[in-house]
Amino acid sequence: MMIFVICIIAAAVGAVAVLCVLSRHNSEEAKYKGAAANIYRDKLLKWSLMNPYQSAENVLSADDSLFVYIKNAYSKGKHQYVFCVGDKVYIGRGRQDNQLILSDPLVSEKHCLIYAENGVACIYDLNSGNGTVIKRGRFDKGFMLNGSSCVLEDNDVIILGQSCLKIKIFKVEADLFDQR
């Protein structure tokens, strides 16, 4: 009888741990999707201010609604970023002209570029010294881009030098504007 009670308690504690992880994940997702909605809203506002006599309906392309959430793949740090892929995201060590700056000595000044093409996120290695490795799935060894490009997929890991970046790709939906 006592063993049965301990098993139930252990199972309940495990369920609480799973719920906490799911809750934290949902909170993280809500934050980066909320940030993307704000960026999208700002793009619409900027367009409206530049074109005061035109309707802002359907002015942004499919590429403008495509976003990427980037975070360090192996640590729970503060460094998390949300970018509109339609704006082109340059990643490198250099402080000029890069949207994401990595302080890794094995990363080139301008290492790679994330961009949108026909509503799909792509990555292009800018002939970096050490190349760009894309890992897909848990057991994938990855493949090297060296001066070439490929389509990015959700949950890809980009390896630049010693830096590993996990990617989430998503589109801004109209219902994101209703969240507050």
Regions found by a protein language model. Give the residues of each.
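Short, surface-exposed beta-strand-loop junctions and turns on beta-sheet-rich folds
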Residues: D97-N98, S108, C122, G129-T132, ...
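Short histidine-centered beta-strand/loop micro-motifs
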Residues: Q80-Y81, L100-P105, L113-Y115, Y124-D125
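Short hydrophobic/aromatic patches on the structural cores and recognition surfaces of FHA
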Residues: I91, H111-Y115, G119-Y124, S128-V133, ...
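Residue-level marker of beta-strand positions
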Residues: S65-F67, K88-Y90, V133, V151, ...
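C-terminal boundary/linker segments immediately following FHA domains
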Residues: K135-R180
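Intrinsically disordered, low-complexity acidic Ser/Thr-rich regulatory segments
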Residues: M2-S103, V172-R180
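Well-ordered beta-strand positions
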Residues: V82-F83, L113-Y115, V151, I159
